[in-house]
Structures are given as structure tokens and as C-alpha cells.
Amino acid sequence: MAPPPFRPENAIKRADELISVGEKQAALQSLHDFITARRIRWATPSTVEPVVFKFLEIGVELKKGKLLKDGLHQYKKLIQGSTEGLVSVGAVARKFIDLVESKIASEQTRADELQKQEIDDDLEGGVTPENLLISVYESDQSVAGFNDEAITSWLRFTWESYRAVLDLLRNNALLEITYSGVVKKTMHFCLKYQRKNEFKRLAEMLRQHLDAANYQQSKSGNNLVDLSDADTLQRYLDQRFQQVDVSVKLELWHEAYRSIEDVFHLMKISKRAPKPSTLANYYENLVKVFFVSGDPLLHTTAWKKFYKLYSTNPRATEEEFKTYSSTIFLSAISTQLDEIPSIGYDPHLRMYRLLNLDAKPTRKEMLQSIIEDESIYGKVDEELKELYDIIEVNFDVDTVKQQLENLLVKLSSKTYFSQYIAPLRDVIMRRVFVAASQKFTTVSQSELYKLATLPAPLDLSAWDIEKSLLQAAVEDYVSITIDHESAKVTFAKDPFDIFASTASKEVSEEENTEPEVQEEKEETDEALGPQETEDGEEKEEESDPVIIRNSYIHNKLLELSNVLHDVDSFNNASYMEKVRIARETLIKKNKDDLEKISKIVDERVKRSQEQKQKHMEHAALHAEQDAEVRQQRILEEKAAIEAKLEEEAHRRLIEKKKREFEAIKEREITKMITEVNAKGHVYIDPNEAKSLDLDTIKQVIIAEVSKNKSELESRMEYAMKKLDHTERALRKVELPLLQKEVDKLQETDTANYEAMKKKIVDAAKAEYEARMADRKNLVMVYDDYLKFKEHVSGTKESELAAIRNQKKAELEAAKKARIEEVRKRRYEEAIARRKEEIANAERQKRAQELAEATRKQREIEEAAAKKSTPYSFRAGNREPPSTPSTLPKATVSPDKAKLDMIAQKQREMEEAIEQRLAGRTAGGSSPATPATPATPATPTPSSGPKKMTMAEKLRAKRLAKGGR
């Protein structure tokens, strides 16, 4: 049996019918069943799309995210075998996103309107205790400004829809463009509604999709994403650029940094350079990220790259160039001092690679590169150039405050200056402290803080100035000693002096405490005695390596100090210069030591590999002998292990049996005690019963039960006697009281009965009197009522009679019209039947006449044929002589004349029939008068026989053949 025809419009019609009766859920389920059926695999996707669109519309309206996701995935699974199917999947995904976005927009508009109305209604605003109590039991949860659950649920549904569509479209070459569009819309959604957590999940999801696409490059399959394609890679790169932009706008700095790494890796493998405008926007976002991260060098580098790209913008103005150039130069000036080299791993080194920098640039190099670049330095504000001269070129700690006082007033009016106030203040403060350490050896705190107090907006409190001073000391730009009693600050001139004195004290203390520690260790070892291992051997005493770190550092610094003090440039330098020289020397020395260690390690590895090679060669030569020895040792060890395991298993079995017996015994005792205690006759303490066996417990129970039974019997006998006397006394006392109560109840019932009876009688009397009053009133107006009734009846009767006569006349007229209509219709039908009968009769007569004419013509032709053939040859057996092809003229002409005559008669008969029919039709209005037949026209003798037309000749020939 063939399957029913595939009609998607029926599914839509069925869904509309269910929606019309309020069954939207059933309509959604019916559409889901239709689009997930296997039969649509062989259908044209364009015919199924309207059903899917209807399914999406209802699903979005009902917020059935899981059902929608399942339906879309099943639909893709069924039709993804063809290109048209994947195109349909893309169209369906776009429709789904459009529906969701329009719905969330309408819900947001409605929520804004409701909120506006609530604000207008409730002038007090906010959340009150009354509103909180009302919100507990109100279904709409619409307390003014308190609960936004409706819009939140739609936001959650929108986010889940975006996720479902991205999962539907991912890693398919034919759906890349749609996938890219949905990604951009999802990021716009997160930005518009400030969905930070959702944006983090989106970024992680996109990374997983890219990882999956990268993994599939080595696989084979249909419609796989080709990352070697320039357009595909550019789309992924544009997504990451937008991801960085949205991360910065949402202030998700960690996510922005991860997105920057994604962009860096994609740009490395991309063969096509991004657009300058896109790169400029990207570097502008990097500027913000690196400013927040606290790395001014990266911040300035990103500014320079942005400016280089922005300078190619034809729409850029000179004012913008001036602002950006000044900002770049100010950011470079605000970079922290890095004159002392850092020791150890720089955590920001990885970030420099993101800007294609081979090494970390110094502050001095950055400033020098900006000054040498005329396209930047030539457009810098003069105030910043003056600031650079004050801080970097001609810095004087005594005059810096006066120089900055007028300059900062001008700079404060600049829009770009406010964000660099804090880093610029740190740079100037660091310069002030370094200059003060060179100028003073000991200075009062008030004088130093006065010297470090800068004009507004760079001013700080005394506490913040002290924090900056301590930070400078931590970073080794100065070395200070603060005496709070005398309020003095002492600056060290040599970094080795303070540390050497401190280290010597610590070393002496450690030397004094070392013997005591050694004695305590020896006493502890004697008390514990020699320790043994599991095999019974005495463990050799291992000496713990004790490294006195302070002493080690002290010795190393002494060596470094001896080396550096022999250098004239070190002795004549300031504290900061000495620290810089010492660190550079240490870095160089450590680098040399590391190179030596690396060489030693390489040599050791080489020797180890050579020894390993020799050992392998030796093992190969003695492999057979070693194998026998090893096999014998393995067998012995295996036998010993098996014996030990067997013994251990036997011991464990015995212990297991004992434990099981004890457990059963304990369980039985516990069960017995529980049952006895549950009955309540005897109570046995479970803790005390642990030391008793089962028989002893039974004897205790029997003794306790016997004792309790005798006590119970005696108490019962006493209680029965007491109860008998008490019951008798109670009955004697309560008998008069019960009689009084019965009498009282009878009196009360009698009084209630009389009151009820009186109430009923009074009500009946009142009702009777009221009805009698009504009757009296009605009797008074009864005559008037009858007169009015007769008057109204007479008036209405005449009106009704007139209406009846009118309706009767109308009915008669309608009947006559109907009769005339029926008669006319029947007359016309009779005329039509009569015409049909006449036409049939004429056709029959005409057919008979034609048959008669045909017969006569056939007879004439036969007679003519007989005359043309000689008699002798017809009767004989010989063949007739050959006849010439053309007969003589005298022989042919009679036959032709006969044929012309027959045709003439036939024409006359046809004309007569037509005239008769025409006459009857014209006289149809008077059927009683018969139509006069038309007299056929007699041909004129002089005119001769009329020639036959070609059609008449052919018709005559057909009739002749039919007659034969």
C-alpha cells in the first residue's frame, strides 16, 4: 500500500485549528512530530520550511527552548545530506534568531512601559515592607521596581536560543556565514543587556568550536571548515576582534586578555592582513586593557601602534592627531622608572609578544623613539614638552614645585591628563626621593614630606607620601631608616653597608645558637635509639643538609662588594647607580654561572648516555645467563610469596570465622535485649549486658519477669478494691445533681418552645394582615382595571385586523406572482421540449431522405456500370479487351448530369428543412398556428444545372461508398 501524500500545508492547518481552540502546546507538539518524522528526509526542504517557521513561532511564544532545540537538531539531521538541506537549515536558524530578537524587544518595551506606569503611580518608589509582603502571594510579582522576573526569563530564553543556534551551525563550511552572523548578534545581545557571565560562556564556546575545527583539519568528511581558506580565517578573526571590543566595553579584562591571545594566534596563521580600521579599533582596545593591567610600557606601545594606523585615516583632523600625540607622549612620561634592572622572570614578557616585540623596551628607549618620531613629537602640546624637560632633562628637587605649579593648571584643562595623574605623580615622587637621598644623609620627616608635597592635583597626604617612600625603598631606589621618635629619615649611601651590618649580627646569633641546636639533636637521637627498617636492618643515620641562608647571602654579597669597590665608577656613584651596577653585575655573573652549569649538565648527560650505551651492550652479551638467573630468582620469590599468601589466607579465614561467630552472638543478645525492653516488663541495660552470655541474660530476664508478675498481681488486687468503693461513692453523690440538671433542662426547653410558638404566630398574623391590605387595595381598582383592559383590547384588535388584512393581501399577491412564475417556467420548458422534439423529427426525416438519396444514387451508378460493359464479355469467361483510359465524351456526360441533378435535389431538401425550422422558431410564441413549410425554389430552365462545390462532391462520394 502506497504511503499517504506528503502535504505540509495540512500540518500547518492542523496547528492553526488547535491554536484556535486554545491548545497551543498540542499544536507545537504536532509540528514537532511532523518535522522530526523520517519521511521529510525525502521531501524538498523548501516545502517543509513553512512548517518549521510555524513551529518556531509557536515555540518562541511559549518559551519551549528544549523542544525547539531538539526539533532543530532533528530537522538538521534529516535534511543535511544535500546542499539545499543545509541552506534550509541556515534559513531556519536566521528565522529563529529574528523571532527571538523581536520577542525580547517587544517584552523589553512592554516592561519599560509597565515600569514607567508604576513610577507614575507610586511616587514614593522603592520597595516597602507592604510591597514585599504582597509579592509573596501575588502571581505577577510586579512590586514596583522590585522583581523583574518576566524580562529575566526572556533574557535567559534568548541566551539559550543563541547557544542552541550556534551549536546547530558550528563547524560546517556551508553555514559559516550564518554562524558568523549569529555570533555577532549574540555578542551584541550580551553587550546590550550587560550579560557578563553569558559573554564569558560565549567566548569559551567559541574557543571550543575553533579547537574542534582545528582538530578536524586532519580528518575527512563533508562540509568541514577549512582554516587554510583566507575568507574563513578572516571571519574567525573578525569574530575575535569583536570579542575583544565587547570584552572591553563590559570591563571583562581577563576575558579581553584571553581574546587578545586568540587574535594573536589567528593573525599569525592568517595570510590576509586585517583592515586598518579594524586594527586601529583593536589597538585602541589594547590601550584600555594594558592601562587597567598596570603596564604603562605596553600601554604606550599600543598607543603608538594605534596612532600609526589612525594616521592613514583620511577623515582624521589635525586636532585629533594633536590629542593622540599628546596622550602617547604623556603615557610615556608617566611610565614607572625602570633604571634599576629587575631580577627574575618578568610575568609581562608574554604580553610583549602579543605586540610583536622581541624584548621588553625600556622607558628611556620608549621616550627616545617618540622624540625621534617627528609625526608624533611634532604634534605634542608645548606644555607636555615643558613637563618632559622638567622631569627628565633638568630635574631639580628644589624648584620642581614652582615649575609644576603653573604648568599643572594648563595641563588640568586637557581632557587626556586626568587618567595619568596617579602614574605621573608616582614618577615625580620617585624622582624627588632619589634626589633627596643624594642631597641629604639625615633629614627630618616634615622637611622631606614638605619637599615631596606637589601642587594639586598631584598632592598627597603625609601618610601616602610615607607609603610612596617605603615603596621606593622596597624597589631599591633608596635605602632608608626611619626613626619615629626623633622624626628623622636617614638615607644610606652604599647598599652593602646596612646589609653587611645586619647580616653580621644574624650570623653571630646563628653561630651562638648552633651548638645548642646540635646538642638537642644528639640528645633526641640517643633517646630514640637506632631506627630499623621493615627488613630489620638498622637505618643509616642521614645527615640533613643545613644551609645557613643568611650566611650564604652574606658571603656572596661580601664577594660582590669586594669586586665592586675596586671599580672607580661604583665608588663615585649614587645609591641608585650602585644598586644598578650591582644588579647588572649579579645578572651577568648568574648568566655566566648558568652557562657553566648548562655545559656541565650537557657533559653529564653525554656521559650518562655513553654509560647507558655500554651497559646495554654488556647486557646484550650476557642476556641469556642473566635471564636464567633472573628466572630462577623469580620462581623462588614466587614460591615464597605463594606460601606466605597461603599462610596469611588461612590465618585470615580463622579470624573471619571468629569475628562472624562473635557478631552472630552479639546480634542475638542485642535482639533479645531489644525485644525484652520493647515489651516493657523488664529493662536490661545494653552496656551492662555486653559482658554477659546468652544463658545468664535469660536467667536475669526470668527472675525479673517473676518478680514483676507478683508485684503486678498485688497492685491489681488493691486497685480493684479501691476502684469499687470509689465508684459507689461517686454514684451516690452525683444522683441528686443529675436530677437537678434534668429539671433545669426541661424548664429551659419549655421556655424555648413557648417563645418559638409565639414568634411563629405573630409572624403569621402579620403576614395575613399584610395580604388582606393588599386585597383591599386591589378590589378598589378592579373596575378601573376592567375598563382599561376593554379599551386597550378594542384598540389593539382594530390594529391587528388591519395588519392581518394587509398581510393577507401581500400573501395573495405573492401567491399569484409565484403561480405566474411557475406557469411561465413550465410554458418555457414545454416550448423547449417541443423544439427538441421537432428538431429530432427533422433530423430523423433528413437522415431518411439522405439514405433514400444515397440508395437512388447507388442504383443509378450500378445501372450506368451495367450499360458500359458489353453483354458478351459479362457472360463469357474471356477477358474483355483493353479499354482506353479515357472514355469518349458522349459516354461520360450522361453520368455527370445525373450526379449534378442528385446534388441539386439534396441542396433543395436541406434548404427546405432549414426554412421549416426557421419558420417554426419564429412562430414559437403562437404554438397553435403551425408553421408553413417553405416551397423549394424551382430552378430556371435557362440557368441549367448548378455546379457542385468541392465539399458537395466529397460528401456525395462518401455516401456512394457507404451505399456499396
From Swiss-Prot:
PCI domain boundaries: 321-496
GO function terms (MF aspect): mRNA binding; translation initiation factor activity
Sequence positions bearing Phosphoserine: 508, 691
Ranges of biased composition (kind: Low complexity): 923-945
Ranges of compositional bias, category Basic residues: 955-964
Disulfide bonds: none
Bias type Basic and acidic residues, positions: 839-865, 895-914
One biological process term in Gene Ontology: formation of cytoplasmic translation initiation complex
Example of a GO cellular component annotation carried by this entry: cytoplasmic stress granule
Residues recorded with modification Phosphothreonine: 935
Subcellular compartments: Cytoplasm
Predominant place of localization: cytoplasm
Keywords: Coiled coil, Cytoplasm, Initiation factor, Phosphoprotein, Protein biosynthesis, RNA-binding
Coiled-coil blocks: 625-668, 702-734, 796-869
Region described as Disordered: spans on this chain: 503-545, 839-964
Function of the molecule: RNA-binding component of the eukaryotic translation initiation factor 3 (eIF-3) complex, which is involved in protein synthesis of a specialized repertoire of mRNAs and, together with other initiation factors, stimulates binding of mRNA and methionyl-tRNAi to the 40S ribosome. The eIF-3 complex specifically targets and initiates translation of a subset of mRNAs involved in cell proliferation.
Similarity-based family: Belongs to the eIF-3 subunit A family.
Subunit architecture: The eukaryotic translation initiation factor 3 (eIF-3) core complex is composed of TIF32, PRT1, NIP1, TIF34 and TIF35. A subcomplex of TIF32, NIP1 and PRT1 mediates the interaction with eIF-1, TIF5/eIF-5 and HCR1. The factors eIF-1, eIF-2, eIF-3, TIF5/eIF-5 and methionyl-tRNAi form a multifactor complex (MFC) that may bind to the 40S ribosome. TIF32, NIP1 and TIF-5/eIF-5 comprise a minimal 40S-ribosome-binding unit. TIF32 interacts with 18S ribosomal RNA and RPS0A.
Note: Present with 52700 molecules/cell in log phase SD medium.
Protein name: Eukaryotic translation initiation factor 3 subunit A
UniProt source species: Saccharomyces cerevisiae (strain ATCC 204508 / S288c) (Baker's yeast)
The gene coding this protein: RPG1
